[in-house]
């Protein structure tokens, strides 16, 4: 793929998501989703490997099915109510179909099976776009229509996502699959709190995207996709290893890192609404996520072989070039917890 083609695809991604975010008409919103879907497929096949082509086909079939269901629900709602406005969903059947379609686009359980498979077959940068930028449009739609959606369905999808995302990530050795199940669990947190405090979903999504982009950038810089090479990284790139450890702990929600803030605020909001059972379940699922993050950290630190390095300088491969934005991303993803009172005020 030529650089010009890549630039066009990235611009189409930006255009499609922007169209969805700024639309109040179901047809324009659906067009934005389709532009984003069609634009990312060439990026998924960037390496021209059979696995990447397979993942692109899986992604296309899943997203096409979800788009078909979403358009059917919007058309049914228009037929029943006579308008295409995004905020006015008066039909229960349309509301239910829209919820399932958006859950399929987000990768919420039980529609999550495509996420780890597609991510495993794609490159690190394509996977980063899938888990960050491609979540903006579906989350924004749920954010806008959440008052009209069925709360019981949303709660079921959210809790099952946090449980399955944490449980299935326990036995993974591929870093991309670990990040996929982490994304499923985080999406469950966001969809759950959107029922009670939608603004908190925006904060949660922002911090999640920040940490995920930083982590994928480190993986791409060090060219690591499995947990086994992490045991050799400490001698080659100690700064990168430290960055991976801090970012994983932040994603796991361990204080005093940035990722603790959204989990703290979500559980606090659930307790305010006298939903102690839900808060307890979320806290337990957060421990599941933290456990498989700790397994990766264990592989990168405590399984290091005793090696003697007689050189003054650490060895780096030719592909190891530190992006200028990486230090900023790592710092923001790990040190923003003291700003939590400001987050609460803004919310």
UniProtKB/Swiss-Prot annotation:
The chain crosses the membrane at residues 1-21, 26-46, 56-76, 96-116, 153-171, 178-198, 199-219, 237-257, 277-297, 326-346. Its EC number is 7.1.1.2. Its main location: mitochondrion. It is found in: Mitochondrion inner membrane. It holds the Pfam family Proton_antipo_M. It catalyses: a ubiquinone + NADH + 5 H(+)(in) = a ubiquinol + NAD(+) + 4 H(+)(out). GO terms for molecular function: NADH dehydrogenase (ubiquinone) activity. GO terms for biological process: mitochondrial electron transport, NADH to ubiquinone; mitochondrial respiratory chain complex I assembly; reactive oxygen species metabolic process. Belongs to the complex I subunit 2 family. Core subunit of the mitochondrial membrane respiratory chain NADH dehydrogenase (Complex I) which catalyzes electron transfer from NADH through the respiratory chain, using ubiquinone as an electron acceptor. Essential for the catalytic activity and assembly of complex I. PANTHER family: NADH-UBIQUINONE OXIDOREDUCTASE CHAIN 2 (PTHR46552:SF1). Core subunit of respiratory chain NADH dehydrogenase (Complex I) which is composed of 45 different subunits. Interacts with TMEM242. This is NADH-ubiquinone oxidoreductase chain 2. It comes from Ornithorhynchus anatinus (Duckbill platypus).
């Amino acid at each position: 793929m030529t650089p010009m083609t890549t630039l066009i695809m990235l611009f189409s991604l930006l255009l499609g998501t922007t169209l969805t975010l700024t639309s109040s008409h179901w047809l324009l919103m659906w067009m934005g989703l389709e532009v984003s879907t069609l634009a990312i497929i060439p990026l998924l096949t960037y390496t021209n490997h059979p696995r990447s082509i397979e993942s692109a086909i899986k992604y296309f079939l899943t997203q096409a099915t979800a788009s078909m269901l979403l358009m059917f629900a919007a058309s049914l709602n228009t037929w029943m109510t006579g308008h295409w406005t995004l905020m006015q969903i008066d039909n229960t059947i349309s509301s239910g179909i829209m919820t399932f379609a958006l859950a399929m686009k987000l990768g919420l359980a039980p529609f999550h099976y495509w996420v780890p498979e597609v991510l495993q077959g794609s490159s690190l940068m394509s996977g980063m776009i899938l888990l960050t930028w491609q979540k903006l449009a579906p989350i924004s739609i749920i954010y806008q229509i959440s008052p009209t959606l069925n709360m019981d369905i949303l709660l079921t999808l959210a809790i099952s996502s946090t449980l399955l995302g944490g449980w299935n990530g326990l036995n993974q050795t591929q870093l991309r699959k670990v990040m996929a199940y982490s994304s499923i669990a985080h999406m469950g947190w966001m969809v759950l709190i959107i029922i009670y405090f939608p603004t908190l979903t925006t904060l949660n999504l922002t911090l999640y995207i920040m940490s995920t982009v930083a982590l994928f950038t480190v993986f791409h810089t060090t060219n690591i996709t499995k947990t086994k090479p992490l045991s050799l990284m400490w001698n080659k790139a100690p700064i990168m290893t430290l960055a991976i450890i801090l970012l994983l702990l932040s994603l796991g929600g361990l204080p005093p890192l940035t990722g603790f803030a959204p989990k703290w605020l979500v559980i606090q909001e659930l307790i305010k609404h006298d939903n102690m059972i839900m808060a307890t379940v979320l806290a337990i699922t957060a421990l599941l996520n933290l456990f498989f993050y700790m397994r990766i950290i264990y592989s990168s630190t405590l399984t290091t072989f005793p090696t003697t390095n007689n050189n003054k300088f650490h060895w780096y491969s030719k592909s190891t070039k530190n992006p200028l934005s990486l230090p900023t991303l790592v710092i923001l993803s790990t040190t923003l917890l003291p700003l939590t009172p400001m987050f609460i005020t803004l919310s």
